[in-house]
């Protein structure tokens, strides 16, 4: 039994958004208040996860190119769900680090395969509106899940994490039953060479495509710097609010409810801003998208610095909401930008995986240093340092704009 690929993509988006939001609305609070992680330990959770991604990203991406996109995606969801359940069941630093390392393994099975599967099933030229609409759907589902996460968190901070893991694993089970795979064309392999050598050959082909395509080299560098700054913000943002800024005493709200309110406000603002923007961006040129990505990175530097230095809760809240809104708009645009830069379907998942690997390198190389700064000088200093790591990405976007847009750059490298 199989269904329309666009509907399957929307289902996958909804399942991921529901499960991830159940987990991540309160997971940082769980790490800080229940597990008791220090700033360095918070970052090391991400470092171990990203090291796993770095080691496994290309091999699992090649599996998706040589064997099956669908199989890779299903395995990924099952592994991620099981790892999340374990992290909520065992509230110990070592268990959290092990669980999220295993989650990283599961993620690598999906990171290149999902986007490549969609492009194969509906065509590269049709993916942008699907990305943008699914991003809106994901925000709506996440908004619905925030209330559930808060309600479950009031019982115990472990519960929304465990339930979220179950939702993600269940999404994988349903995908195994309904996901079609009609457009997939395995990378060619000679029967004598076997699967392993075919995987190596596909990986080399993907690397050659990256080397000879200037825009893909730029994208890899941008991904690395993006990973470095996001490590500081993602791991330390909530800890900064809890330990440095403090939550106001208003109507007797629990800190759990406060974080639910912050998450809901962030999503509502993203929906309000994204709806008109998405309609326009469906028809935007690739050069326009490059300029938007450049502007977004400049804005992110400012909002993260303000967030890190803010002493008043309301100033920190405004900066946090602005940062989250900008990030929610950048994600689907960056994916579309990358997808249209890949001219060979047989290595599409591999190139996506290489890009994710660059992001992982940025996170695990920058993460421990940022965490050490947080331990010695405080979380504020770590957040500002992380924001400064976006500056090289801004310069790389500016270079792409100066070279007259993405299309010209691809042609020059082909």
PLM feature spans:
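Helix-loop junctions on the cytosolic side of multi-pass membrane transporters
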Residues: 164, 169-192, 399-410
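Helix-loop boundary and gating motifs at the non-cytosolic
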Residues: 1-54, 215-263
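Transmembrane alpha-helices of Major Facilitator/SLC transporters
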Residues: 52-55, 258-282
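Cytoplasmic helix-loop-helix junction between adjacent transmembrane helices
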Residues: 100-139
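Conserved MFS/SLC helix-loop-helix module at the cytosolic interface between two early adjacent transmembrane helices
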Residues: 53-91
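Juxtamembrane intracellular "pre-TM" segments in multi-pass secondary transporters
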Residues: 1-3, 180-220
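C-terminal ends and interior cores of transmembrane alpha-helices
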Residues: 78-92, 297-311
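Primarily marks hydrophobic transmembrane alpha-helices of the MFS/SLC 12-helix fold
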Residues: 73, 290-293
């Amino acid at each position: 039994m199989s269904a329309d690929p666009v509907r399957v993509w929307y289902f996958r988006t909804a399942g991921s958004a529901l499960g991830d939001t159940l987990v991540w609305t309160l997971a940082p609070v769980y790490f800080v208040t229940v597990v008791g992680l220090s700033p360095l330990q918070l970052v090391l959770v991400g470092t171990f996860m990203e090291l796993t991604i770095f080691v496994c990203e290309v091999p699992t991406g090649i599996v998706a190119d040589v064997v099956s996109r669908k199989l890779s995606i299903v395995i990924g969801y099952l592994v991620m769900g099981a790892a999340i359940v374990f992290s909520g069941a065992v509230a110990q630093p070592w268990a959290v680090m092990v669980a999220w390392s295993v989650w990283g393994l599961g993620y690598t099975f999906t990171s290149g395969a999902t986007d490549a599967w969609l492009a194969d099933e509906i065509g590269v030229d049709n993916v942008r509106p699907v990305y943008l609409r699914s991003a809106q759907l994901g925000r709506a589902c996440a908004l619905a899940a925030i209330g559930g996460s808060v309600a479950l968190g009031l019982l115990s901070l472990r519960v929304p994490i465990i339930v979220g893991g179950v939702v993600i694993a269940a999404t994988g089970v349903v995908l195994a039953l309904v996901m079609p795979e009609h457009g997939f064309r395995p990378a060619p392999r000679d029967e004598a060479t076997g699967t392993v050598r075919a995987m190596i050959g596909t990986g080399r082909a993907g690397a050659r495509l990256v080397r000879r395509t200037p825009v893909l080299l730029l994208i890899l560098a941008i991904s690395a710097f993006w990973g470095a700054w996001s490590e500081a913000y993602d791991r330390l943002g909530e800890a900064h609010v809890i330990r440095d800024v403090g939550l106001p005493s208003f109507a007797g709200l629990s800190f759990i409810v406060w974080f639910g309110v912050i998450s809901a406000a962030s999503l509502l603002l993203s929906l309000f801003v994204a709806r008109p923007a998405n309609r326009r961006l469906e028809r935007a040129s690739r050069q326009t998208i490059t300029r938007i990505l450049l502007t977004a990175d400049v804005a992110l530097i400012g909002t993260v610095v303000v967030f890190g230095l803010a002493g008043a809760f309301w100033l920190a809240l405004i900066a946090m909401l602005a940062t989250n809104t900008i990030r929610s708009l950048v994600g689907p645009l960056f994916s579309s930008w990358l997808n249209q830069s890949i001219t060979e379907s047989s290595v599409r998942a591999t190139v996506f995986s290489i890009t994710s690997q660059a992001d992982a390198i940025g996170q695990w190389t920058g993460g421990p240093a940022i965490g050490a700064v947080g331990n010695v000088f405080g979380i504020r200093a770590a957040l500002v340092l992380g924001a400064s790591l976006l500056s090289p990405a801004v310069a790389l976007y500016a270079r792409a704009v100066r070279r007259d847009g993405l299309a010209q750059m691809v042609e020059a490298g082909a």
